[in-house]
């Protein structure tokens, strides 16, 4: 049997982390078995569905490199197919027209709740022989079995059973002629030959209804797997108040797609004590029976740890591609400065996100207006004039601008003055970067460049002179 799964988001908002994890699990399951992965946009909610949300879903999938073999399919383009199936069901008696008014249904619901009963349709029109006018508004309901039960073996949770007495006759077409979500899903899964439905646990109650419709249509019933929800660090369902945002916000915040994928796969799935997984490893090892039934808590610190790992373990050229987007957002012109690959090598150990890296690399490309106040107060004092002038002379004398020669100039200055490297390195660091922290001075000064470094040392010496004049 060829495995075929689908990811079927509703375009009413951004692709959030829960949806991204569901997409990842479906994608991994399919790729593990060499099957096919379908992208389907369930846009039947015409009032809430937006093109912006569709674009955000597509952007998120592409950024995460979760490619699809079919689609994207749009339910709004398949209404003729859904209605043709409904008409066929009306003919063979597996569906019927319901003329109950909204007022009657509201009264029924209120009475049932008052009596402590579960609100459900009472079947008044199910076997009614009453005649109604052709123009009288009606919906179409599925004639759900009234006896027996629906049992399915959830691939994550095990056997789940629903009594048919608990399921009412689902509306499958509204009064305006549009098919409903639960029905469209069934026809899509049937037509697209979906073998495994992997989705969030909030869909468990939809499953018995969908299975009954599939059986009424004589369609094969796929396997189902329902993934547990993601919680915030307070134990409550992850939401916007926890900072939960669309997947692309993680891109904007400087996370690598490899880090987010690694984090999401471990958010409910495990393989021993292993924490780091390449996409190839995930694909090889992923199984549904290793997915936990329990909810998982989102931990931003863990994601940052993984991101730091990938910043420093992926090829610098690959990381630099993502960094280039970050520096563009900050308006940094990198044409006059080191290649971004060098920035990744220089700042990788110091940064948890690429946004942090982009913000930290400005001094390699742009002049700064002022020195960090604390760093200047501590290191750009009159006593720093001699080492700065001496190291400037040695840097200016370099004819072949290499990291080794820069290092020798700094070390040579310290040796000649008979002081520790810090007495030269710290004033030099503040002079050329404007701050008190940076990578090693030899690699930093080399990356900034000879002319720019000398100019900044002059600026620092002028700052010291102004400071002396004010004392």
Swiss-Prot record:
Cofactor note: Binds 1 zinc ion per subunit.
Enzyme Commission (EC) number: 6.1.1.17
Taxonomic superkingdom: Bacteria
Binding site for ATP: 240
GO biological process, one term: glutamyl-tRNA aminoacylation
Annotated compartments: Cytoplasm
Motif 'HIGH' region, residue numbers: 9-19
GO molecular function per UniProt: ATP binding; glutamate-tRNA ligase activity; tRNA binding; zinc ion binding
Cofactors that this protein relies on: Zn(2+)
Family matches, as Pfam families: Anticodon_2 (PF19269), tRNA-synt_1c (PF00749)
Coiled-coil region(s): none
Keywords of the record: Aminoacyl-tRNA synthetase, ATP-binding, Cytoplasm, Ligase, Metal-binding, Nucleotide-binding, Protein biosynthesis, Zinc
One GO cellular component, as annotated: cytosol
Catalysed reactions, semicolon-separated: tRNA(Glu) + L-glutamate + ATP = L-glutamyl-tRNA(Glu) + AMP + diphosphate
CDD domains from the UniProt entry: GluRS_core
Disulfide bond annotation, renumbered to this chain: none
Binding site for Zn(2+): 98, 100, 125, 127
Motif window: 'KMSKS' region: 237-241
Keyword Endoplasmic reticulum: no
Subunit description: Monomer.
Job of this protein: Catalyzes the attachment of glutamate to tRNA(Glu) in a two-step reaction: glutamate is first activated by ATP to form Glu-AMP and then transferred to the acceptor end of tRNA(Glu).
Family: Belongs to the class-I aminoacyl-tRNA synthetase family. Glutamate--tRNA ligase type 1 subfamily.
Official protein name in the record: Glutamate--tRNA ligase
Species classification: Bacteria, Pseudomonadati, Pseudomonadota, Gammaproteobacteria, Enterobacterales
Gene name in the database record: gltX
